[in-house]
């Protein structure tokens, strides 16, 4: 444990000599009448921090050192935006709002966001916090320093296919919404952020909720929620460009612009981006393009906004990973892979020369090609002084394929007859196929918000959504050495899936006493799912399933005074199996069942900005959260993958994730700051049934009733960021991440695991204001500064091998050794 904890203590010691930040408070009032405005929303760097009191007052206990953006919004008034400089001394800022404005983007997402009144655990990240880390890597790497988060990359350097786990739960258990619209694929529940490259450059805030959290649209949260907002309204014209280059020939170029307010009522914003990389893994290249465009109309208490964004990705397939002997150099072990047909002779030879950067494929166009176009129409409408409505219509169009060279494949696997040549019969051929997805996802969401001006004791939301997903799955043969009866473009399998999902929820917070707040939330969700047709192995995957879930939540907050708060909540989350749980069920495993999560969260928050033990106005912000996530029929990863790299899963009757999350943030004026998180957890299956296979691939139950660790669930995760400003405009940061051992399957076998690892990054940013532009920023990110050699993901499987003994085959995803990204950013 000390290897994870002591580095944080050491960083605290470095920060201790100069530890301070200051509070900001004031009163918000009507510019015409001077009357206070209770319930006005206060946002700092895009993150909602609370609302004004019945007297119109607000207080931010501790504003970190450095420049910030303070934003104040209220239904029926123009939003107010002003710069704010964090400093050790207390500041008072009284502001007056002009009538006629509208609660802008916040009204559209407030229905799914948590606050300090919802008794849940969450982390808010504003545009500035995201921008510090945004060098072109995918979103999981920008969230890697948040509590309980673990990021990994198939290609090794954060570009292309990436993965995020929170509390050991992968992307299929993390509900992701953009402006309240579901992003998770309805069939797989995954959020494939590779399809939206450089999305971070258009995000103005993210809220990361851990546990079940508040009710969300889309698939249920089984470990966390990512609530993303791109709804920033900038009233002044702007333009900026970000350009990065670094290791593995990695490039990022983007241009962003905004017109500001045009003709009193209209705004237009846009972005064009391109990210490209050769990847750390050999041939694991990425070519990613995206755009973002928003057109807004606001007048009085009405905001109408159309948003479209799109991404197109072409990535060389790296989802097979690297065989263990390629990393260890163990030739005897490599021979086992060769003897059992896991590797060809050529692949085994390359494993010895390429090592940990080995790639399974050599066919030049072994690529994944996909485009995803999003269209959203949002309405925010003030309904008198106490009510507001946020509503959205959405359409997502996705289509693409991955292309593969297949050696020595049977004609029968493609539903083709054998080829007769004279007296010979050919049963196999080399060929190239493409597996396609072609889909539409469409629907609507709404949130009716009640926040009385005269009394902020009660806040309530009634919301919901209806969504439909239509998805075609099919394969095409585009070339064959021996064509049989096929022709270019011939389909060899086809199935059509339909999924309908609708939900409704009601949520309220009530300040029963000055020190006691109550929270309640209830959601009803119904799903209908149907598949018709055959899959690539020519098996019939016809499926019919429907589910209805009731998910209640309740909690309470207790104010202890002096910046202290206790909170506790209990929430139920339920969700349906994903597509592969139906179509790829392994022999020996029962049909997949729906999962249930009972989530208990309890914690303590402490925030003071008026202490003096480290100097005047010393500020301290600490929190401790206990979680007990108890599952019934949890679907856990078996450690195996299907042929497109998707993890295979099985139900386990009883399991749990329990632990504590400790977080802290301290700062000293504008000179030095430290954020630190530590998660200690125990993740167990109480009655695991281990299935292996004999030489004929018949299932054999190896063990039953075992108490084992849940796969991919580290017991210790920590993250620490020490940042300082030794000179004006120059900011240096050290980022340290530790992750303990993770097991690749549920047998808790150390020979099927990922070793613990520790990674140190260095970030340097230098901002200039030369006069001919608003800002010129030079930045460098050195990742894995100490050149650690580690793998952050992997998979495993076992069977009775050619030797007659059980053989285990481990595959890993090595992460890049020391590498860098340098950027030049210009703001006009």
Model-derived regions, located:
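C-terminal beta-signal and adjacent terminal beta-strands/loops
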Residues: 4, 729, 738-743, 766-828
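Short, acidic, small-residue-rich periplasmic hinge/interaction motif at the N-terminus
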Residues: 29, 41-45, 73-77, 87-132, ...
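Short acidic/polar hinge/loop motifs at secondary-structure boundaries
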Residues: 59-62, 182-210, 229
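Extracytoplasmic beta-strand/coil segments of soluble accessory domains associated
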Residues: 140-182, 204
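Transmembrane beta-barrel wall of Gram-negative outer-membrane proteins
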Residues: 238, 245-276, 281-320, 324-329, ...
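Face-selective signature of the C-terminal outer-membrane beta-barrel domain
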Residues: 369-408, 412-536, 559-561, 566-569, ...
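Membrane-embedded beta-barrel scaffold of Gram-negative outer-membrane proteins
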Residues: 388-394, 559, 565-571, 594-658, ...
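Gram-negative outer-membrane beta-barrel transporters
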Residues: 514, 616-630, 650-746, 825
